[in-house]
Design a protein with these regions (language model features):
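Class I S-adenosyl-L-methionine
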Residues: 1-202
């Protein structure tokens, strides 16, 4: 998360959704987590640059498909902290999704420029991967430029949202910070996911 291209700038803005980044708080609380994030990011950047995204996708898809076979994992959240390291990473995950058709992929991102560029170049995005674009500020409307979006609302505004066929509220915060059986973020029929506030004050 400390190496996020867009997020590192958004953290400086008072009303941005990255202001109280949970991954950064975890990194500050546990040094080993910070070192792990940093190492993994550097390894990914190096692999994409040195081997190219097709080869990295081949390796990653082997790992991901193996997880399904051995652990029954059918849903893959891309990035539990941080964001894409480059446009190449988006290309890589598209290829992984093509190779792992029986699994669903969800990639939350604020790397608007890289994603926009990739989407212009790749016309056949596999149906089992969702690149869900987060609006940068709290209470900002969904970014309609992108098909799949997410927003973070203050509690009062979140409470006023009514679920529709294409807009759903995330309820993980109220069920032990766990998705449980919910897969709204992975569902191509859900265009907008609304999150409650992560933290309101410093």
């Amino acid at each position: 998360p400390e190496q996020c291209n867009t997020g590192s700038e958004l953290r400086k803005i008072a009303d941005s959704v990255c202001r109280f980044c949970y991954s950064m708080r975890l990194c500050n609380f546990r040094k080993n987590v910070k070192l792990s994030y940093r190492r993994n990011t550097e390894l990914l950047i190096s692999a994409l640059d040195d081997m190219g995204y097709p080869r990295v996708a081949e390796i990653m898809s082997f790992i991901v498909c193996k997880k399904k076979q051995t652990m029954g994992i059918t849903k893959v959240r891309i990035k539990d902290g941080g964001d894409a390291v480059s446009e190449l990473e988006f290309f890589m995950w598209v290829e992984v999704a093509r190779r792992c058709r029986e699994q669903k992929f969800w990639c939350p991102t604020k790397e608007y420029g890289w994603l926009r560029s990739m989407l212009r170049k790749v016309k056949d995005i596999p149906p089992n991967i969702i690149f869900r674009v987060s609006s940068p500020k709290v209470n900002q409307l969904p970014m309609k430029e992108f098909k799949y979006r997410s927003v973070v609302y203050t509690q009062d505004r979140y409470d006023d949202v009514i679920d529709t066929e294409s807009t759903k509220k995330c309820r993980a915060k109220y069920q032990g910070n766990a998705c449980l059986e919910c897969d709204y973020c992975y569902d191509p029929k859900i265009y907008t996911v609304v999150y409650p506030p992560n933290r309101i004050k410093e």
